[in-house]
């Protein structure tokens, strides 16, 4: 059974250092979120069923700073492998969001939009776009540099993507203080909505909820 040790250096510190190196700017905010794993119920999460989740000690962290050119630039440093760099404009995100809206054909029959195909920039940029439109970020937001560092191995069932999503949202909000439970529930909903609108890999809502709301003690029932 594979085991992953907790790194000695905080993930948020590594994200901030990488952000400064790659963008030349000091991050305005950093945030992190834990790994998650499903105990039972993940197959009924989509239908609103009860899910039992746990969180781990490994974390993903995000550092952010503003841009003024309407672009979301993403720099991802995974637990294993080479860094990835991608970008997307807020205008392109708006067009992708429009394409995902349901419509009707000439006979009035519903037309189901195609599944999203977005990669790294679309997933992370989609969180920015959705937070703006759900009034969690100012409509004056004109782009962002976003650097993600993760200690959570991909494909291990530990919610590496969900942890990164949550860390991005918290950093964008400048969530230095504790958020109350209703706001945490709203942020989880926004993360899931964004990922399912823009990203090729769909989200498990319960992972976002657990990463935001679990105390880390015992099982989180969602």
Residue ranges, per PLM feature:
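ATP-binding N-lobe of GHMP and related small-molecule kinases
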Residues: 1-162, 166, 170-184, 190-199, ...
């Amino acid at each position: 059974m594979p085991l992953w040790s907790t790194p000695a250096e905080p993930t948020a510190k590594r994200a901030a250092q990488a952000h400064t190196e790659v963008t030349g700017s000091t991050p305005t905010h950093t945030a992190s979120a834990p790994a998650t794993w499903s105990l039972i119920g993940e197959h009924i999460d989509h239908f609103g069923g009860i899910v039992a989740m746990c969180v781990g000690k490994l974390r993903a962290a995000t550092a952010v700073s503003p841009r003024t050119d309407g672009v979301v630039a993403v720099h991802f440093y995974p637990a294993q492998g080479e860094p990835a760099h991608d970008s997307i404009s807020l205008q392109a995100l708006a067009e992708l969001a429009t394409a995902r809206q349901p419509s009707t054909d000439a006979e009035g029959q519903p037309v189901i939009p195609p599944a999203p195909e977005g990669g790294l920039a679309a997933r992370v940029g989609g969180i920015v776009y959705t937070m703006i439109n759900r009034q969690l970020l100012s409509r004056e937001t004109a782009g962002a540099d976003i650097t993600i560092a993760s200690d959570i191995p991909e494909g291990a069932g530990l919610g590496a993507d969900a942890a990164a999503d949550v860390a991005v949202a918290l950093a964008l909000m400048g969530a230095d203080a504790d958020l109350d439970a209703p706001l945490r529930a709203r942020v989880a909903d926004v993360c899931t909505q964004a990922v399912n609108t823009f990203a090729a890999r769909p989200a498990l809502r319960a992972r976002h909820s657990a990463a935001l709301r679990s105390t880390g003690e015992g099982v989180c029932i969602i």
